[in-house]
């Protein structure tokens, strides 16, 4: 009965209004009041602050600065093996596996449309049909920056307006098409394993989603899908190395990553498994592997310089290369 109530209350809650109000409070710099709420959050969710570059709650001028905190360089290491794709986030695997034509598995009894997930654009979805996907949930205690599973060059970004349902496991099991209904940002990359789509899914009280190349992408400016294309062969091209920061959530959410058919094989992962940034997620299929001998090395995770963690400011560039609304 309680679970039913938790799910169905979301249909009548003013989720966008609530999220924007919480977002404003999370950005506010309120001194000791901010510190009090950060300490309360750390205790409630058992956040491991020994991994944070700045361990003391008093360091963070706003709640969002705490929530998007930088980790110590040695806290995570990137598997640099040529044939390995890494986990992009700290989180929990919700689902993973094959994309069946245009259908992605969400939970028992629920699938959602690949095309709808990617903004309702068949040409964007086409490369990923019958490919692979992985959905990873970021809990409140997790590190909330998103990194690249493999090196890639940004080709397109879409902002897709939508609902802001919670994305926790209970909601995923009960709300049809959840990840294709919620507000989201889609980033498309050319990579050594073909096209890759990184979908950053918003949720209740997720005040905004940011990327390292465009700054804040949400809150939105309208109710239509917006599409930006990017140069790939000029000095202005956005090229990100494996393990480089891609973006961040201000309050937690979910990512869905999609790959083309016959390009990758998932490693030993399963629904419910806890993921750590930098650890192996998948490998290139045999036909995609380099002929040169494999070399396995590890390097510390480096946060992007696009964000100023001390000043409390983020890059304010607007998405470029021709918005298509």
From Swiss-Prot:
Membrane topology: Peripheral membrane protein
Region annotation (Disordered) ranges: 281-325
Active site per the UniProt annotation: 90, 147, 253
Pyruvic acid (Ser): modified positions: 253
A GO CC term attached to the entry: plasma membrane
Cofactor field: pyruvate
Cofactor binding comment, as recorded: Binds 1 pyruvoyl group covalently per subunit.
GO BP of this protein: phosphatidylethanolamine biosynthetic process
PTM comment text: Is synthesized initially as an inactive proenzyme. Formation of the active enzyme involves a self-maturation process in which the active site pyruvoyl group is generated from an internal serine residue via an autocatalytic post-translational modification. Two non-identical subunits are generated from the proenzyme in this reaction, and the pyruvate is formed at the N-terminus of the alpha chain, which is derived from the carboxyl end of the proenzyme.
Site (Cleavage (non-hydrolytic)) location in chain: 252-253
EC number per UniProt: 4.1.1.65
Keyword set includes Transcription: no
Lineage: superkingdom: Bacteria
Pathway annotation from the record: Phospholipid metabolism; phosphatidylethanolamine biosynthesis; phosphatidylethanolamine from CDP-diacylglycerol: step 2/2
Listed GO MF terms: phosphatidylserine decarboxylase activity
Entries under Pfam families matching the protein: PS_Dcarbxylase
Reactions mediated catalytically: a 1,2-diacyl-sn-glycero-3-phospho-L-serine + H(+) = a 1,2-diacyl-sn-glycero-3-phosphoethanolamine + CO2
Polar residues: bias regions: 284-305
Record localization: Cell membrane
SUBUNIT field: Heterodimer of a large membrane-associated beta subunit and a small pyruvoyl-containing alpha subunit.
Family to which this protein belongs: Belongs to the phosphatidylserine decarboxylase family. PSD-B subfamily. Prokaryotic type I sub-subfamily.
UniProt-listed PANTHER family: PHOSPHATIDYLSERINE DECARBOXYLASE (PTHR10067), PHOSPHATIDYLSERINE DECARBOXYLASE PROENZYME, MITOCHONDRIAL (PTHR10067:SF6)
Name of the protein: Phosphatidylserine decarboxylase proenzyme
Naturally occurring in which organism (per UniProt): Alteromonas mediterranea (strain DSM 17117 / CIP 110805 / LMG 28347 / Deep ecotype)
Organism ancestry: Bacteria, Pseudomonadati, Pseudomonadota, Gammaproteobacteria, Alteromonadales
